[in-house]
Amino acid sequence: MFATAPTPASRRRRLASMLYEAVLLFGVGFVATLLFDLLIRAGGFPLLRQTWLFLAIGLYFLLNWYARGQTLAMKTWRLRLLDRHDRRPAPARLLLRYLLLWPLPLACAWLLHQVAQAGDWLALDLLIVATPLSLFIPTWFDPQGRFLHDRLVGTRLCVAP
């Protein structure tokens, strides 16, 4: 696919893309929640709403990764998602990547909440918004600097040509 081997994306570029992605996901989440509320027309279904939101965000990522190999934020920061053979990953691999990117930040959010509750430091719960940054911890231990979910699935983020 590339004349030369793709350049791995720097942590700085991935962080910038992630922050921009968070802004875009606010819009995706808003529209998904609005549609849910209009379709269901009843409150009291928080688990169903969270599932709907999880699916909407997943659809956003999967469609973009499959169609172009990148989301709008990734395109802005010139990032592309590739597999081991420098091609766009297969749909099953993309789905697995989406599912595996959640456990680490969710575990960190849960741990942070437990510490806040145990120490009666409720303001500490505000730091939960920073738990997606926990995705960067494994990059310091991977020889290629990949996220844990990318290492497990066999994908990587590279600088787009």
Language-model region placement:
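Membrane-interfacial and juxtamembrane segments of integral membrane proteins
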Residues: 1-161
